[in-house]
Design a protein with these regions (language model features):
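Conserved AdoMet
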Residues: 2-117
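A structural alpha-helix within SAM-dependent methyltransferase catalytic domains
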Residues: 95, 131-135, 259
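Extended basic-aromatic, gly/pro-enriched interface segments that bind polyanionic ligands
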Residues: 119, 140-238, 242-253, 275-277
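Conserved SAM-binding loop of SAM-dependent methyltransferases across substrates and taxa
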Residues: 123-144
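A short glycine-rich, Lys/Arg-flanked "PGG" loop and its adjoining helix->strand segment in the class I
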Residues: 252-264
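Conserved beta-strand signature within the Rossmann-like core of class I S-adenosyl-L-methionine
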Residues: 264-272
Length: 301
């Protein structure tokens, strides 16, 4: 090893080896349009490890001792672009249509549990947004449909006997740590209005911390979507702007996994620019007000 001052040369066969390893580990596919990004991230890790040859680094990645470095590489390949209340038309569809239907259906069955999975949660803004939307939706729902008993004092965010569980997962440990801390800067809070800040956040210096009552609704965990061990019995899954990093074969496998992870008639939200068209017939597409959600079907149509 030596102190690196110049990029390590990388041949096409070496790049192909790295592409294959990344694909096998997490399903991310780097086509010709994204090889520059892959090369750049590889050079960063070579410099960080002070390794001056690709094959030395590859041997490290594939060794038992290199598991931590493999995690570091995969973290560098993920893009943690997220914000509170991102893609508002989808969130309005979730709150005003999907949640309304779920609450009505579950109350009829005396099923008081609600389970949502945020797959690819990054630094936590999406699952905390979902928690806020659910709390607001439950409050509004019971203004119009009173509970058959008195509400406890002080009023909890989630009225009993409801139990809300939001599973938030990512492959990036650093992003998960930020999400678990639940502390955000003023610029990260730009899309959160004043009333919402007062109700769900505490001001800590020049930052904002998610209030414990809201934070307790979200459980953060490491999950690799390539594996079969994924959260089950979900009423809705949010996996937005994740499948764009997968090839068609991996997209189809992931969509099938989500089908198994959803409750009957559960809902799948994907990115605004993503679609299940041509990938599966096991979901019914619902489109309202420039937003789309896919509802699980019980059998191929």
């Amino acid at each position: 090893m030596s102190t690196l001052t110049a990029p390590v040369p990388l041949t096409e066969p070496e790049l192909k080896l790295l592409q294959t390893l990344v694909y096998q580990e997490c399903g991310m596919y780097f086509d010709e349009r994204r090889t520059h990004f892959l090369r750049d991230r590889l050079q960063r890790r070579l410099k960080a490890c002070q390794i001056d040859s690709f094959y030395s680094y590859y041997r490290l990645l594939t060794s038992r001792e290199g598991k931590q470095e493999l995690v570091a590489l995969l973290e560098n390949l993920t893009v943690n672009e997220t914000s509170f209340f991102r893609i508002r038309p989808q969130l309005e569809l979730f709150q005003k249509s999907v949640l309304e239907e779920l609450l009505r259906r579950k109350q009829e069955r005396r099923d008081w549990s609600l389970r949502i999975w945020s797959a690819g949660c990054s630094t936590g803004q999406e699952p905390y947004t979902l928690a806020i939307l659910i709390c607001d939706a439950l409050a509004y729902y019971y203004l119009r449909n009173p509970l058959p008993f008195d509400m406890p004092t002080p009023k909890p965010l989630i009225p009993p006997p409801w139990k809300v569980e939001i599973i938030a997962s990512d492959i990036n440990y650093s992003a998960l740590l930020t999400a678990q801390q639940g502390i955000y800067t003023e610029s990260q809070m730009e899309t959160v209005d004043y009333t919402c800040r007062l109700r769900y956040f505490d001001k800590v210096g020049d930052k904002y911390a998610v209030k414990p009552a809201l934070k307790n609704l979200v459980q953060f965990d490491f999950h690799n979507l390539k594996t079969e061990y994924l959260p089950q019995r979900n009423d809705a899954i949010f996996c937005r702007n994740v499948m764009i990093y997968f090839d068609e074969a991996e997209q189809k496998r992931l969509i099938e996994k989500f089908h198994r992870c959803l409750n009957p008639d559960g809902y799948l939200f994907v990115g605004h620019a993503e679609s299940l068209f041509g990938l599966t017939t096991r979901y019914h597409m619902i489109h309202q007000n420039n937003a789309t959600v896919y509802q699980r079907l019980e059998a191929a149509q």
